[in-house]
Curated annotation (Swiss-Prot):
Transmembrane portions of the chain: 124-144, 156-176, 186-206, 219-239, 247-267
Protein family (similarity comment): Belongs to the orthopoxvirus OPG166 protein family.
Annotated glycan sites: 29, 58
One BP term from GO: positive regulation of phagocytosis
Organism, as annotated: Vaccinia virus (strain Copenhagen)
Function: Promotes, when overexpressed, the influx of extracellular Ca(2+), leading to membrane permeability and host cell necrosis.
UniProt protein name: Protein OPG166
Membrane topology designation: Multi-pass membrane protein
InterPro entries, per the entry: CD47, CD47-like_TM, CD47_Vset, Ig-like_fold
GO molecular function: thrombospondin receptor activity
Swiss-Prot/TrEMBL keywords: Glycoprotein, Host membrane, Membrane, Transmembrane, Transmembrane helix
Localization in the cell: Host membrane
Amino acid sequence: MSRVRISLIYLYTLVVITTTKTIEYTACNDTIIIPCTIDNPTKYIRWKLDNHDILTYNKTSKTTILSKWHTSARLHSLSDSDVSLIIEYKDILPGTYTCEDNTGIKSTVKLVQLHTNWFNDYQTMLMFIFTGITLFLLFLEITYTSISVVFSTNLGILQVFGCVIAMIELCGAFLFYPSMFTLRHIIGLLMMTLPSIFLIITKVFSFWLLCKLSCAVHLIIYYQLAGYILTVLGLGLSLKECVDGTLLLSGLGTIMVSEHFSLLFLVCFPSTQRDYY
């Protein structure tokens, strides 16, 4: 009877113990730690993704064998109990990760990828607000110019140009919303921001038609050009997930402020001459 009891206790210590956990991750995670703790002494530790080996560590020879598809994988600690797996995002694949040793003890972790927004909700809202206000001010500038001068070919070009800019940016806004990181949303953001350079051309046309070209106008144009440069730099830094869009917002905000100054200058300051085109 005692011999049977000892056998049962021995078998119990060697029985396969499987604990399944679910870990959620996003593209914002640079590295991911997959937990595993093995209390029993072992000769080797093996991590698998489904049926494919990721990492095998031989505790006797202290050597590690890595899969060529998971070169960033490493053990969190080489202690007897903590054998958690650390792996970089570029090597992570959703699926079931299994930790085992020569005694058959296992810990199973299921990784689930969650999709996240390209920018946070606050930054996305500000992008739409800045773009919308800029287009509204552009509409007011063109309207004021149209009612202040006699219609001409140059005025017609200004009106068509303004309509094209507005259509491109509005289409970009529809493609960009919601701000997920996909090809469609990248194209949408580019359409929302890059046409801002043409606002400088419409500004020059408006001031030229109203004969209000002066040093102050040059300062406004340079200010808007600086905003466009900030926007382009912000775009370059934002072409990946989970980024801070502060620089991009600074550029869009600068462009919006320059449009305010332009409209104010058009309305409040007299032209340098009385003849209109």
